[in-house]
């Protein structure tokens, strides 16, 4: 069994224990502890859903449209004002220990770099909780992403309540939990000197999905001595590197005869998000051929033999627009760009399904070759339906002692766009240690120095394609968005988190090596931990996907664990 499979099994097991621990945790502790825990429990029960729901109604996703930035900033300001109002209301009942708001902001090249939040205490040692209030785009609006509601979903074999809406799980729900924990801490230590020498800080990132404002903030004010990034799973010991290549082919002149792929476009969205739909438009001067294709293409699609006979193809819809044939495929399953393997195993990618099928129709001359067809041929040749780079393992496939086989470098082909000039493919790559230019020494914690080996690997790849399949050249430009980050699970900070987890849950803390990028990357004092207990990002959670939902019981237990971590940090505030 691969490391990833083991982690999925262990995290689900711990999730079951987590739900069972709810009653245990609520009833444990001294009489003073009971009073403070009752505040935490009461606030979780009465305010988590309503406060998160308010944030979910505010659209805070960025798009490629330059006009989206102002809308996002305006709604983030509304989010800030709402949270500040909650803090002010809470502070009225406090005598000495109050939530003190802070804000850091500056203009960036394309986006506002902005962090805000609350502090308890003012000591030189700083302990932090991080969450973010921006989200990825909602995709198809039919699922009512900004109309939060609670519904029962089957989760680990039983019906559980889920809060549904964009950001409920990533990361507005966790952000509200963090604020509830801060209020519980202030309630517990009001009128005491327990926080002397210590500052507990809650930071809300406003651009985690795109630009990581916290990184700029830390450059200016310094990194906390210890912090929990509440935006992942329990508990991240390594994050893969992130690479973002763009492959392009010139569109060229339309074929003068026959029918051809006029455009191939994924639905608007982020590169780290498998799109909910992909649409291909087929046109040409042979109307009889277009009619035949419209009549037969659904059967051809069902009969087409993908490179894996067990491959699950995305649902296809066929329509007409004037004489053109329009093909639309729809996503099934996980949509987070860091887990294309989960989508491949349990769902279907609309990009991969339609690209491979149409490349075949170009190969067999049903469709005339052009720039779009050339790009789809490159996609089918380079990756087919695979996600680990198996078609060109010498260049694309890597796994290692941290990111083991089954959890190595992944390729999510997420964005294909056709313009009047060219067709472009964007890939979300989460890469293992072997794709980095500087080897890990096996012991040093943190982000690896240097950059990836992908520029050379991709140059070899496109040259190999040109040799194997001569035709219009594919060009590539790539950006190394982040290098891998590896931690020591035996370090004191991990052991402190583990101790709090075990006291709250009654079971050992799991460890995960993930593809997702968090605010902890590059900051060795920060650990990405919680709020989820599973690496399964597809249904019913649907991380970055349609019908995103937060398992309420799991998230509330995560708040209890986070609270225990903070209690321990305050009790041992001289510990580094």
Give the positions of each predicted feature.
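C-terminal motif of bacterial Sec signal peptides marking the signal peptidase cleavage site
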Residues: 25-27
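N-terminal helical capping/dimerization or prosegment-like subdomains
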Residues: 32-139, 422-429, 436-440, 451, ...
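Zn-dependent metallopeptidase/amidohydrolase metal-coordination segment
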Residues: 40, 157, 326-336, 419-421, ...
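Active-site metal-coordination/substrate-binding segment of hydrolases
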Residues: 124-204, 221-222, 549-557
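Acidic, glycine-rich active-site loops and adjacent beta-strand->loop/helix elements
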Residues: 133-135, 199-214, 221, 230-235, ...
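Midchain, well-structured core segments that form catalytic/ion-binding scaffolds
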Residues: 215, 220-443
């Amino acid at each position: 069994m691969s490391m990833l499979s083991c982690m999925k099994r262990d995290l689900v097991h711990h999730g079951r224990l987590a739900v069972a621990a709810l009653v245990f945790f609520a009833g444990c502790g001294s009489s003073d502890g009971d009073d403070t825990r009752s505040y935490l429990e009461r606030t979780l029960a009465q305010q988590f859903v309503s406060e998160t729901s308010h944030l979910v109604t505010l659209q805070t996703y960025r798009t490629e449209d330059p006009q989206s930035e102002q809308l996002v900033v305006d709604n983030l300001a509304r989010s800030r004002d709402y949270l500040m109002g909650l803090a002010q209301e809470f502070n009225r009942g406090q005598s000495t220990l109050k939530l003190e708001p802070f804000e850091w902001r500056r203009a960036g090249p394309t986006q506002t770099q902005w962090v805000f939040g609350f502090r308890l205490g003012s000591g030189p040692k700083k302990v932090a909780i991080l969450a973010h209030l921006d989200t990825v785009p909602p995709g198809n609006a039919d699922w009512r992403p900004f109309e939060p509601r609670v519904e029962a979903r089957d989760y680990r074999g039983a019906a559980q309540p889920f809060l549904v809406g964009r950001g409920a799980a990533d990361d507005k729900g966790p952000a509200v939990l963090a604020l509830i924990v801060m209020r519980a801490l202030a309630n517990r230590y009001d009128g005491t000197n327990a926080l002397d020498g210590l500052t507990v800080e809650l930071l809300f990132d406003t651009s985690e999905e795109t630009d990581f404002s916290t990184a700029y903030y830390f450059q200016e004010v310094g990194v906390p001595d210890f912090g929990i990034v509440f935006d992942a799973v329990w508990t991240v010991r390594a994050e893969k590197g992130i690479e973002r290549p763009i492959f392009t082919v010139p569109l060229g002149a339309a074929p003068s005869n026959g029918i051809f792929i006029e455009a191939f476009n994924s639905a608007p969205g982020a590169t780290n998000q498998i799109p909910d739909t992909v649409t291909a438009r087929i046109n040409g001067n042979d109307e009889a051929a277009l009619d035949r294709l419209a009549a037969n293409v659904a059967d051809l699609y069902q009969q087409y033999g993908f490179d894996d006979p067990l491959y699950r193809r995305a649902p296809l819809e066929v329509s007409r627009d004037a004489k053109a044939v329009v093909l639309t495929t729809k996503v099934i399953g996980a949509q987070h760009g860091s887990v294309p393997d989960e989508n491949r195993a349990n769902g279907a990618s609309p990009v991969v399904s339609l690209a491979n099928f149409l490349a075949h129709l170009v190969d067999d001359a049903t469709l005339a070759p052009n720039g779009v067809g050339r790009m789809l041929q490159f996609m089918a040749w380079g990756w087919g339906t695979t996600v680990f780079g198996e078609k060109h393992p010498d260049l694309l496939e890597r796994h290692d002692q941290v990111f083991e086989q089954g959890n190595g470098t992944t390729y999510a082909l997420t964005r294909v766009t056709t313009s009047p000039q060219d067709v472009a493919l964007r890939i979300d790559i989460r890469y293992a240690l072997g794709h980095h230019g500087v080897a890990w020494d096996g012991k040093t914690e943190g982000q690896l120095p240097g950059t990836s080996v992908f520029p050379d690997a991709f140059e070899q790849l496109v040259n190999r394609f040109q040799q194997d399949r001569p035709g219009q050249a594919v060009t590539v430009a790539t950006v190394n968005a982040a290098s891998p980050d590896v931690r020591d699970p035996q370090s004191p900070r991990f052991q402190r988190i583990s101790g709090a987890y075990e006291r709250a849950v009654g079971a050992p803390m799991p460890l995960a090596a993930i593809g997702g990028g968090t605010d902890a990357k590059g900051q060795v004092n920060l650990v990405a931990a919680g709020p989820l207990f599973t690496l399964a990002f597809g249904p019913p959670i649907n991380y970055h996907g349609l019908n995103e939902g937060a398992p309420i019981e799991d998230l509330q237990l995560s708040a209890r664990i986070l609270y225990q971590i903070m209690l321990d940090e305050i009790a041992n505030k001289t510990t580094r």
